[in-house]
Design a protein with these regions (language model features):
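Autoinhibitory propeptides
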Residues: 27-118, 326
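Sec-exported extracytoplasmic/periplasmic mature domains
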Residues: 70-73, 208-212, 238-246, 263, ...
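Substrate-binding/access-modulating region of protease and related hydrolase catalytic domains
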Residues: 225-366, 413-429
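N-terminal domain-start motif of subtilase-like serine proteases
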Residues: 61-64, 89-149, 188-190, 301-305, ...
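Short glycine-/aliphatic-rich beta-strand segments at the starts of folded cytosolic domains
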Residues: 2-11
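Extracellular S/T/G-rich loop segment that most often corresponds to the catalytic His/Ser-adjacent loop
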Residues: 151, 346-440, 444
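Acidic glycine-/aspartate-rich tracts in secreted/extracellular proteins
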Residues: 13-14, 82-83, 152-156, 162, ...
Length: 459
């Protein structure tokens, strides 16, 4: 009998202990347990995930996993995800030039001025600086809010952008293995910059950097995933937020804001069947079926497990911001005519087994009901009006659009380095950083309330 390590995700509202108890005992003679669903043997736990109400990890054969999927309590059964940098979504007084033909690092983050104005201050002159003396003026700076950058790589811990106005670093050298149920997380050396990622550093700089970011006084945290099991990707953040005491001044816990400029990817290759709007339409990729993808033929692939992880984390009160993706796909809600569009592949797609549906209009799996999904507002104009970037995912599940093209922010090569990048990865920390300012004023807001604010106040 060949067993594999599987992650089981339950639908919301079911008792995890009950199903684990059924699996951990031999139920051969128990007539109340369906042997066509629960194996007639004692199943071994791999990780009971005590920090989670809906997730646990067990050892099953492939056949047993298929049968267990028929349990009405079970939403998904997948092999554990392994982080891949392929999932990344990127392709003050300053020069505020918005659109540039070549990289220009003398500029500021043009999103700082675009996102505080109802209109396009550049007019048709997006390749020019704004008038002399134009500044980004602010009084909110994210004080009292904890910002977490969530990604595989760490950002450069010693970069000057993490300093406050007095030159003191706001980076909290937090050891995640001090949290309950997180003892297996490796200790982080916050003096070691080896392996720091440019993408992570740039994104963090846009959210909380002292020059390029919004939340210039938020506390800054990092949880790099390259060396972590999937079990800790969200459980550690849940435990972090649970452990907070109520602030006697505000009457609430310090808000936790997480920015995630990544998403699980799949390829429009090795296709054996395409299901489009309820019908099989062959096995050849076509834009007629909403199959576009990026230049490498990739799209964001949904999994129930990652969705459940995010939803459970947000149920704890954590605010989560997710990049829409740069794969030119439509993202939609359940009930949309394209929500169930999927392909069947002859090979596995990471945690998705060969032969199982790979949905291509749901976005990446790490999107919960209260997640704010951010698209890329282009720096250039189309027919003299502002528009989304051509590569950005679009559709009704994109909540808000923010500056994401020609964005200057921090780089990982040294402590003062900056560079320019494009993508929904760059848009997302704009909104996460602005949300730190909103939560500074409204620390008791739930994730649903904050997302509603964006819906009500975006234009």
């Amino acid at each position: 009998m060949s067993e594999k390590h599987y992650v089981v995700s339950l639908h919301k509202g079911f008792n995890k202990d009950e199903i684990i108890n059924d699996l951990n005992r031999d139920t051969t003679l128990d007539s109340k347990v369906d042997s066509n669903i629960i194996p007639d043997r004692k199943v071994d736990n791999v990780n009971t995930r005590p920090s989670s109400k809906r997730m646990f990890e067990i050892a099953l054969t492939d056949e047993e996993a298929i049968k267990l999927q028929n349990d009405p309590r079970v939403g998904g059964i997948e092999v554990p995800e392994v982080w891949s940098d392929d999932w990344l979504d990127y392709e003050q007084g300053a020069d505020w030039t918005r659109e540039v033909a070549v990289d220009d690092l003398t500029r500021g983050n043009w999103g700082l001025l675009r996102q505080i104005s109802k209109t396009n201050a550049w007019g048709l002159n997006t390749t020019n600086d704004l008038s002399a003396g134009t500044t980004y003026d602010y009084h909110l700076d994210g004080t009292g809010v904890d910002y977490i950058h969530q990604e595989g790589s760490k950002f450069r811990y010693t970069h000057e952008q993490w300093q406050d106005r007095n030159g003191v670093s706001r980076l909290v050298p937090f050891q995640w293995n001090t949290l309950p149920n997180c003892g297996a997380i490796p200790t982080i050396d916050y003096t070691n910059v080896t392996g720091a990622g440019g993408h992570a550093t740039h994104c963090c700089g846009t959210a909380v950097g002292k020059d390029y970011g919004w939340a210039k006084n938020s506390a800054i945290y990092n949880i790099p995933y390259l060396s972590l099991d999937q079990a800790f990707w969200f459980d550690a953040i849940k435990e972090f937020h649970r452990a907070k005491a109520v602030d006697p001044v505000t009457g609430f816990k310090r808000p936790t804001v997480v920015s995630a400029s990544w998403g699980k990817k799949a390829n429009f290759t090795s296709i054996t069947d395409i299901q489009f709007r309820g019908a099989s339409v062959g096995s050849v990729k076509s834009a007629d079926f909403g199959m576009i993808g990026d230049t490498n033929g990739r799209f964001n692939a949904a999994t129930f497990g990652l969705q459940a992880e995010v939803e459970e984390m947000q149920d704890e009160g954590v605010h989560y911001f997710k990049s829409a993706g740069n794969q030119k796909q439509k993202l939609c809600y359940s009930g949309d005519i394209d929500y169930d569009n999927h392909i069947i592949r002859s090979v596995a797609t990471g945690s998705i087994t060969a032969g199982d549906p790979v949905y291509y209009n749901r976005g990446a799996g790490n999107i919960g009901p209260d997640t704010v999904v951010v698209g890329n507002l282009d720096s250039m104009l189309y027919n003299n009006i502002e528009a989304t970037n051509e590569g950005s995912d679009k559709g009704p599940r994109v909540d808000v659009w923010a500056a994401g093209t020609d964005i200057v922010s921090a780089h990982s090569t040294d402590d003062t380095a900056i560079y320019q990048r494009d993508g929904t990865s760059m848009s997302t920390p704009q909104v996460a950083g602005m949300s730190c300012l909103l939560l500074q004023l409204n620390p008791g807001w739930t994730p649903a309330q904050l997302r509603k604010w964006w819906h009500d106040n975006s234009i």
